């Protein structure tokens, strides 16, 4: 990894006496697909050698779980191996104890006028992302832009991002298992008189936990428009995070699970470990990672794709859209390019 980032030009950034926010997802306890702390420690050590003052950071979550406040979040991070000793730097929850410590960054975007970004990330001099590249049930995949836009948003910011992404229930698929009811943090789901899950949209915040938990494809995202709008907003939040800051991005195309690391479980990887990629351009990086996964062979390990019909013909097909047909990840990259975050054109250089 160190050889890769040096080849990609990270040493061109002046790190001396600069606070560097290393934005990483600590993983929900129980999930085993997140980036291991060994990589974070190596990056922190490199940054220190360049004169930086690095810290690992993430913002609190909107949904129920063990990362919705700073106390539980830090305990979860430690449980997954992230602490000042193992990571070689401090661990800071960027939006504070209850997710209320944020700054509004005025960008006057088409969808978001003043994104709410975790204060510690705003106060940092430099932003460096370490991204686990994988599928995502609401955005198609999660990579650099997802880690920036959604990951750096405060709890209130996440509410704004999810405001157009409410799920629906395919009633014919519901098995009355009650798992979505038990795990909804906002008491927005109940079983109706027919024992079918029903969503109260006055309470639903669109976090997507029910979509991730449902084993029967009963809870699904509404339509392609909601995924597109969410990806547009994520791009604009990413712009707010990176505004006037030197930045660098590293994506781990390893343990490519079908869904995000926010849940306390993970499905089997869909493709072999494909390596690590790095760039100054988060848009080009996401596009390159997507293409690499799309063109990779599927693992024959009883995963989401290998269990699907005609799986032997999926090499070169859009694996993310096959897993999450209601999503449109391309829309997010196109909008990010439109607002000047980067370009989808790239050159792959193997190190």
Regions found by a protein language model. Give the residues of each.
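Extended, low-polarity segments enriched in aliphatic/aromatic residues
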Residues: 1-24, 29-39, 45, 50-58, ...
């Amino acid at each position: 990894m160190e050889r890769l980032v040096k080849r990609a030009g990270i040493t061109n950034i002046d790190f001396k006496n600069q606070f560097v926010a290393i934005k990483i997802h600590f993983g929900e306890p129980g999930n085993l697909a997140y980036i291991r702390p060994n990589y974070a420690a190596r990056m922190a050590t490199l940054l220190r050698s360049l004169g930086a003052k690095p810290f690992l950071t993430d913002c609190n979550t909107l949904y129920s779980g063990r990362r919705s406040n700073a106390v539980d979040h830090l305990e979860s991070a430690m449980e997954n191996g992230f602490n000042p000793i193992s990571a070689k730097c401090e661990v800071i929850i960027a939006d504070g104890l209850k997710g209320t410590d944020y700054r509004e960054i005025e960008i006057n975007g088409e969808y978001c006028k003043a994104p709410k970004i975790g204060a510690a990330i705003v106060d940092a001099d430099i932003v460096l992302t370490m991204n686990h590249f994988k599928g995502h049930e609401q955005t198609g995949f999660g990579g650099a832009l997802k880690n920036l836009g959604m990951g750096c948003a405060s709890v209130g910011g996440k509410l704004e991002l999810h405001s157009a992404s409410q799920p629906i229930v395919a009633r014919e698929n519901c098995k009355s298992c009650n798992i979505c009811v038990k795990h909804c943090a906002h008491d927005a789901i109940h079983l109706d008189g027919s024992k079918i899950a029903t969503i109260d949209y006055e309470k639903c915040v669109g976090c997507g936990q029910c979509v991730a938990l449902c084993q029967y494809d009963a809870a699904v995202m509404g339509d392609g428009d909601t995924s597109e709008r969410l990806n547009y907003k994520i791009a604009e939040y990413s712009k707010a995070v990176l505004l006037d800051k030197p930045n660098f991005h590293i994506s781990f195309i390893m343990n490519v699970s079908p869904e995000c690391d926010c849940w306390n479980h993970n499905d089997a990887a869909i493709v072999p470990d494909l390596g690590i990629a790095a760039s100054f351009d988060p848009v080009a990086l996401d596009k390159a990672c997507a293409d690499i996964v799309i063109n990779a062979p599927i693992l024959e390990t009883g995963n989401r794709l290998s269990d699907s019909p005609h799986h032997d013909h999926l090499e070169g097909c859009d694996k993310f859209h096959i897993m999450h047909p209601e999503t449109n990840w391309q829309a997010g990259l196109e909008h990010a390019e439109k607002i000047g975050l980067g370009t989808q054109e790239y050159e792959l250089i193997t190190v």
